[in-house]
Amino acid sequence: MEVFNLMTNQNKPYGKIASGKRNSKKRYVTYRKTNKRKAQIPPEVKESVRIAFLGGINEIGKNMTLYEYGNDMFLVDCGLAFPDADLPGVDLVIPDFSYVERNADKIKGIIITHGHEDHIGGLAYLLKKVNIPIYATKLTIGLIKGKLEEHRLLNSAKLVEIKPRDNITLGSFNIEMIHVNHSIPDAVGLAIRCPAGVIIQTGDFKIDTTPVDGDMIDLSRFAEYGRKGVLALLSDSTNAERPGYTPSEKSVGDSFENLFRKANKKRIVVATFASNIHRVQQIIDVAYARKRKVAVVGRSLENLVKVGSELGYLNVPQGLLIDINTIKNYADDQLVIITTGSQGEPMSALTKIAFGAHTKVTLSPNDYVIISATPIPGNEKMVGNVVNELMRHGVEVIYEKMYDVHVSGHACQEELKLMIGLVKPKYFIPVHGEQKHLQKHAKLGEAMGIDKKNIYIANIGEKIELCDDKIKLVENVPSGEVYVDGIGVGDVGNIVLNDRKHLSMDGIIIVVATIDSSTGQVVSGPDIVSRGFVYVRENEALMNSARDLACRVIDENYNVKFHDWNAVKSGLRDELSHLMYERTKRRPMILPILMEI
């Protein structure tokens, strides 16, 4: 593993990098790896810059964008998405890297805007295809290291640490990192400069005037670029439907203080997003003030606390954290348990606790559970099931509909309008959202005075060109979804998924028979095995009918001379499927297994 720090003169990074801070008296320092030639003057005739959307458009998750100028390319983010219910057995969904692989020699690196899964979760899979330098802030690098270590890629990775207001040069591009507020520290937006002009990509952001860490979004840099002229703005659309402003993260801390006071003699359990360091910090602060010890449950949360503490993003008083195995040594009013599972995930710690499946935490009526999150669309039923189960155990449960225990990390309408007003782009491209979010954000752009013809709602896979007078669709590049199932990547396609759906709906019937090749007679079987279709002992008449039918089909279709197995198997599938539907109105999968002796 090669890790570079921009403020030292050791381990010089892969591109030209200038480092600077707000209100810093340090000089900007420039490093070059080996190339000592003078910078070439851009030609008078400019090319147009092109953008390819490989993920994060018309969907939530697997964000990935490619920028191209001349023969130079670079990537922004490489995330994952979690599978919908119609993808049985699939663990993760990542972008299609075909276009990236095809242009591997042109790609100068990848910049990661922040450490959420939908922005870093696909990195390990990308690096197995193309090993390019990764540029990210300190915390994001820390989280990426954990991902790469799991895939045994850490030693070969090229990681370059960057900070807000640093500038990096990747071929024809010079990119400045701009600090933004989000639900994880160290998030940045990008000012992307090339001979064609300046493009601002906000990344995930909100405008928090009272951030927990005291570091407000760098609006002055966005405004400065707006004064100089911006060719295009790519802006976060997640909350484009929500009017007003997103509340400050600090307001959740105030809610925690009130709720912890009310809990008094009870044991407090707080479920939140594992990546929300500011939320975890506020829980720790209130627990410390109430003289309670804190235990952490859930692998991802444990990792976040470890990385956040080591890198200085979490301030944990000495002796406050205790091992989950020791919680029985403390009275209920001396404990706070922070856990994963705010989305009701089936294998999460909170779900296991609720259903009595957790080996270390057992519920009691004296527990006080706070779910500090809003259900992601599609997760409402799972969260509801967990809440109901907790309440069946006599546990008092507090969630967002009852109390202000969560705020979003994304900008609402007034913040989005402010960003547009500061940047004043010629072209506006809403990103990071479903179609409804992109459309609503586009309307906000129109309301802020951007010409409708200069607003472009992209589709995944489109490569566009920012021309002098319009945005032009150049081509559609390979894109879409690649499914990760266990250690398999991309080996689960529509055929496999259709089989899984078929099995999940009507089950399977397996027909096993042994045939004498010289006579064509069935010498063993047919045996009928049913899984997920009917309970055999209660349907013996149906199974006997299936056996008789299988014998007849084999006799009629098996040809001693030609041994046409396909005809026999096709006949078995057709006839048995007809029988099963006639008797049960179900269509199980029919799988014939024929052996010849």
Regions found by a protein language model. Give the residues of each.
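Intrinsically disordered, low-complexity RNA-associated tracts
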Residues: 1-43
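His/Asp/Glu-rich metal-coordinating catalytic cores
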Residues: 26-111, 116-330, 348-362, 381-385
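Short glycine-rich phosphate-binding loop at a beta-alpha junction
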Residues: 133, 429, 591-592
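Conserved hydrophobic residues forming the short capping helix/wall of the S-adenosyl-L-methionine
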Residues: 148, 445, 580
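Short Gly/Ser/Thr- and Asp/Glu-enriched loop/turn motifs at secondary-structure junctions
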Residues: 163, 459, 586-590
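Broad gene-expression machinery/nucleic-acid interaction feature
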Residues: 172, 187-189, 334, 506-510, ...
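Hard-cation-handling environments
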Residues: 242-372, 376-425, 429-562, 569, ...
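C-terminal tails and terminal domains of large nucleic-acid-associated
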Residues: 561-597
